[in-house]
């Protein structure tokens, strides 16, 4: 009888363990279902945004509203969005066209849009996409750059006509500098970020200098990419803000390492 009781107890324990495993499996399945199901639903929403942008290509007022709504959605987006059919290419084409890139082929005729607000929200959307991209999609920044984003953003810093847009561009560059610093350096992005540094507030200055410090880690293909910005960085070394000075020091250290002959300093 004692052995029978032990056997019964063991069977009950095994059944309890199986029940727990089944419960865990069900919870995991439900969790994955919410993730992928939610991702598909969110992707459908962004495909609707893409269609709305295409349909509003020649309606600046309507297009601005769509861009504002898209920016709001992306500002709270999580990595789940990218697990479905997120229309990355289509959205980037529309956003970059708003910033001044070539007309998308989806537009039957050419149109012009000189709205600074539209450009601001388009750039903001790109920044949010870079922020929301999950580790499982490691090439989002590269995809963004493949569309000619960096040269286009540089032109916005070279011809500052809308301060809010320039500040947003610097934030975008700070995100890109973590993964695509070499492309920024080759395009002359360091000088573009620093040439009007004193024109911005302290927080934007910190963003610009942080981005340049990331870019300074890259060995430049041409020394002029560094020598053009050395006078500005040298001036920043004398600023009173500790974070700006720290970024400037990082720049100098990286350049001395990458250019041991002292070609830049």
List where the protein language model places each region:
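Regulatory, intrinsically disordered low-complexity regions in eukaryotic nuclear proteins
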Residues: 29-33
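Acidic, Ser/Thr-interspersed intrinsically disordered low-complexity regions
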Residues: 2-28
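Elongated alpha-helical scaffolds that mediate protein-protein interactions in large eukaryotic proteins
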Residues: 34-44, 51-65, 69, 73-121, ...
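Long amphipathic alpha-helical scaffold regions
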Residues: 206-212, 234-237
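Alpha-helical solenoid cores of large eukaryotic proteins
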Residues: 69-73, 125, 129, 172, ...
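Register-specific detector for alpha-helical tandem repeat solenoids, activating on a conserved position
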Residues: 96, 127, 151-154, 170, ...
